[in-house]
Amino acid sequence: IKIMDILAKLGKVLAHV
């Protein structure tokens, strides 16, 4: 797992909210 992957997931979650 790379930092970019985590940021991408967080970005999607935040965008969903």
UniProtKB/Swiss-Prot annotation:
It is found in: Secreted. GO terms for cellular component: extracellular region. Expressed by the venom gland. Its main location: secreted. Keywords: Amidation, G-protein coupled receptor impairing toxin, Mast cell degranulation, Secreted, Toxin. Mast cell degranulating peptide. Its mast cell degranulation activity may be related to the activation of G-protein coupled receptors in mast cells as well as interaction with other proteins located in cell endosomal membranes in the mast cells. This is Bombolitin-3.
